[in-house]
C-alpha cells in the first residue's frame, strides 16, 4: 500500500499552435503581385478579379493594385468576394 499520495495525471495538457488565419490586406490597401490577401480554412471569401486561390484556400493577388471587397448573392446566401483593381 502506498503511504504517499501519487500525483495525478491529466489527459488535457496540450494545445495546438495558432495558425495565423485571417485578412492580411484590408479594403483600400495597395498590394503587389503575389501578396497574400487572406489566409482561411475553406472558402469563406471567394476569389474575384485578379485574385488567385492556393491549395490551402489562401487568396493572393495576381497583379498589383488596390484591394476591394464586395458582397455577392450566391445561391440562397450572401458571399464575400475580394477583387484587385488597378491602382490609379
UniProtKB/Swiss-Prot annotation:
Pfam families listed in its UniProt record: Ribosomal_L27 (PF01016)
Region (Disordered) location: 1-21
Domain of life: Bacteria
GO annotations of cellular component type: cytosolic large ribosomal subunit
One Gene Ontology biological process: translation
Molecular function GO labels: structural constituent of ribosome
InterPro entries reported in the protein's UniProt record: Ribosomal_bL27, Ribosomal_bL27_CS
Segments crossing the lipid bilayer: none
Keywords: Ribonucleoprotein, Ribosomal protein
Family per similarity comment: Belongs to the bacterial ribosomal protein bL27 family.
Name by which UniProt lists this protein: Large ribosomal subunit protein bL27
Taxonomy of the source species: Bacteria, Bacillati, Cyanobacteriota, Cyanophyceae, Synechococcales
Amino acid at each position: 500500500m502506498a503511504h504517499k499520495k501519487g500525483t495525478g495525471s491529466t489527459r488535457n495538457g496540450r494545445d495546438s499552435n495558432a495558425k495565423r488565419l485571417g485578412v492580411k490586406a484590408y479594403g483600400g490597401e495597395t498590394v503587389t503581385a503575389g501578396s497574400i490577401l487572406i489566409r482561411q480554412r475553406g472558402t469563406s471569401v471567394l476569389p474575384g478579379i485578379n485574385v488567385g486561390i492556393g491549395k490551402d484556400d489562401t487568396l493572393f493577388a495576381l497583379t498589383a493594385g488596390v484591394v476591394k471587397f464586395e458582397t455577392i448573392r450566391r445561391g440562397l446566401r450572401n458571399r464575400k468576394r475580394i477583387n484587385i483593381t488597378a491602382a490609379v
